[in-house]
């Protein structure tokens, strides 16, 4: 009788250890999956905010019949991306009265680099022209 109880206790311990290992692996997997979903949600929220902001800027310019204005390079990039049609890979934006630094070049096949997003646009930020490539 003691042998059966000992075997049962050992078997239960082995099974419990296996279940514990599996649940820890599952917790680790689901925690990474949860973080991935959270990051994706944050990116989607940020894209939605950017889109709403650009829509507001463009509607305001259309209403006042003035050239599009941008405060940062990120705004320029989003305006150009929204105005692009077809298979456009590059765009060069010229700012009105910007002097020697009045051109901004964007690769539309990739997202804008983080270090360029918050750079202020020269002068008042009015777009003079956009060249598509």
UniProtKB/Swiss-Prot annotation:
This is FPRL1 inhibitory protein. InterPro entries: FLIPR, FLIPR/CHIP_sf, FLIPR/CHIPS. Belongs to the CHIPS/FLIPr family. May be involved in countering the first line of host defense mechanisms. Impairs the leukocyte response to FPRL1 agonists by binding directly to host FPRL1. Residues 1-28 form the signal peptide. It is found in: Secreted. Pfam families: FPRL1_inhibitor. One of its GO terms (cellular component) is extracellular region. It comes from the Bacteria. Keywords: Secreted, Signal, Virulence.
């Amino acid at each position: 009788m003691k042998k059966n109880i000992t075997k049962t206790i050992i078997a239960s311990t082995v099974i419990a250890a296996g279940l514990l290992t599996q649940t820890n692996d599952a917790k680790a997997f689901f925690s990474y999956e949860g973080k991935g979903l959270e990051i994706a949600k944050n990116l989607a929220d940020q894209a939605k905010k950017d889109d709403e902001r650009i829509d507001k800027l463009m509607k305001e310019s259309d209403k006042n019949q003035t050239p599009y204005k941008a405060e940062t390079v990120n705004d320029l990039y989003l305006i150009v991306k929204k105005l692009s049609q077809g298979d456009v890979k590059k765009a060069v934006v010229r700012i009105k009265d910007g002097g020697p630094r009045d051109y901004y070049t964007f690769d539309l096949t990739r997202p804008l680099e983080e270090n360029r997003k918050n750079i202020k646009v020269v002068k008042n930020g009015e777009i003079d022209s956009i060249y598509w490539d």
